[in-house]
Each structure stands twice: as C-alpha cells, then as structure tokens.
Amino acid sequence: MTSTDQGSWARSEGDSWDIVSSVGYTALGVSAQRAVESERPDALIDDPFAKHFVLAAGEPHLIETITKRDAPQASPFEYLRGMGMRSRFFDEFFLEAAASGITQAVILAAGLDARAHRLAWPAGVTVYELDQPQVLAFKDGVYAQQGAEPTCDRRTVAVDLRDDWPAALKEAGFDAGRPTAWSAEGLLPYLPAAAQELLFERMVELSAPGSRAAIEGPTGTLGMSQFAKVEQKYRSEKDTFGKIDITELFYDEEKTPPVEWFSVRGWSTQGLDMFDLAERYGVRHPEVPEDIRELAGAMHYLTCTLPA
C-alpha cells in the first residue's frame, strides 16, 4: 500500500488518499485507538473490527501499537482516553436516535467506522457511509475476509465530501423527507472554512423536522494553531501516530463554532466537553496539566436537534 512518508501529504485542492496516506491514515490511527480501548478491562466500547483493519493495512507502527503496548499513551487525547469517550458518545447518539424512531443515519467521512456492523440497530434502519472510494474499498475487503455482515441496511456512498455528495446520497436511496441522524466525527479540522460551511448547509437542506446531528467540533475558545501547539508538546513516538504530525493536515482558518452555526438556524443544541464525558462514563483521570485541560475543554461533543 502507499507509504506513510508524510512528506507527500501536503493538503491541496481536490487531494485524495488511501488508508495509509494523508487523511486516510488518520482513520487507521483512530482504528488503532479503538482497538486499544476495546481491549481494556473497563472498555467504553466494543469494536471487534478495529484491530483487523490495522492488521490488514500492515503499517508497522500501528500494529505495534495494538499488539505490544507497554507504556501509557502519550498524546493529550490518548492520555484522557479521548477515543473511548468520543466513540461511546457517538454510539449512544445513534442508538438513541434509532430508538426514537429515526430510521436513516448518515456517517460523514466514515473512515473505518464499524457501527453498521457492531451496533445493535433496530429493524428497518438504513446506515449510509460516505467516504473516499479507496477507504471504503479497503474496509469492505476486511469485512469480506472476516465474513462480517452488517446489523442494519448498510449502504456505502463513495464520494468526496467536497463534491456533490447530496446527489450521490440520494442516488443510494436517501430520503430527505424523513428525519435523519447525522454524524461528523473527527472531520471538521480537515476541512477549510468554506467547506465546513457548505457541509453544514447541505446537512440542513437534507434534514426533515425531527432530524438530529452529532458533531465533534471546536468551541472557538482555542485556535487550531494553539491546539496543534499543545498536541506537539506532548506528542512522542510512543503514541498512536508516532512520528506523524496529524495537525499538519488541519486547516487553521477562522470557522464558526458548530454550536453557534446550528443554534441560529433553529436547531436546539447541547454541548459537552471531554470532562463532561468523563463524568458521564465514570472515567477517572490523574492530575491533568493545565494546558491539556484547556485543550480538552476546547472541543465540544455536540448534539443538535431540528424540532419536529
């Protein structure tokens, strides 16, 4: 597969990637973090596919991460068990939406998200996964190797979110007249400001009353450059991404915080930070350095609802 040499990962208009390059590699790193969390005795999630994605990709550092870890994870996000809490938050969002009667879910930039296979969806739910063609093809190949079957009506939509993804989504069977559960997890830092604005506009245009959205996004209290500075301070070769600096893939542009964007358009919003999630899930942290505390408080785990 493609080399993990970051020198070739500079972002550009219309860039693309497979699972071991650029933004695709971040999905693989996230899968490694989910695999590590799933093996904990007090695991917040159960993702049996995460380790298989990592092993199939064959990237040595990530394989070592999930098979030979003998030291605490070093980056701020890992230090706080951020991936376990984030994944649990989105798991609960989708299951609660489905339990309320919402029968279609859309996972934007799905990456190696395995919820269509690992969550206990009610009968009649359709889950749409949108991402780059090479990423979805890799994931489908691993599912085939494992003999895995989805627990819902899973439909993949191979499309770049900078293109006309609403048309591709509708072609796959999406019905804009029915309420939808949307997710934007680990996505927004990789979008320019204009692309984020367009993404939100399209979500709203496609949302019937009663729709919901779960979004991981900045509160606006910490700029992306400050965020990257703290990440770099604590990053080491022992954390999931090793020598790879994923913040170089971020767009450091002024963006409207999602909570503000959706609120002014009539959606009700509820935002939680990482420490709110820790309290909800009973995660205990050791003494947290002030800059890590500031970093954790700068990200919202947001639930937005369009009144019925």
UniProtKB/Swiss-Prot annotation:
EC number(s) on file: 2.1.1.-
Binding positions for S-adenosyl-L-methionine per the UniProt entry: D131, D160, L161
GO biological process: methylation
Pfam families found in the cross-reference section: LCM
Domain of life: Bacteria
Keywords associated with the record: Methyltransferase, S-adenosyl-L-methionine, Transferase
MF-aspect GO terms: methyltransferase activity
Alphabetized SUPFAM superfamilies for the sequence: S-adenosyl-L-methionine-dependent methyltransferases
Record PANTHER family: S-ADENOSYL-L-METHIONINE-DEPENDENT METHYLTRANSFERASE YKTD-RELATED, S-ADENOSYL-L-METHIONINE-DEPENDENT METHYLTRANSFERASES SUPERFAMILY PROTEIN
Function field: Exhibits S-adenosyl-L-methionine-dependent methyltransferase activity.
Similarity comment: Belongs to the UPF0677 family.
This protein's name: Putative S-adenosyl-L-methionine-dependent methyltransferase MAB_4585c
Organism this protein belongs to: Mycobacteroides abscessus (strain ATCC 19977 / DSM 44196 / CCUG 20993 / CIP 104536 / JCM 13569 / NCTC 13031 / TMC 1543 / L948)
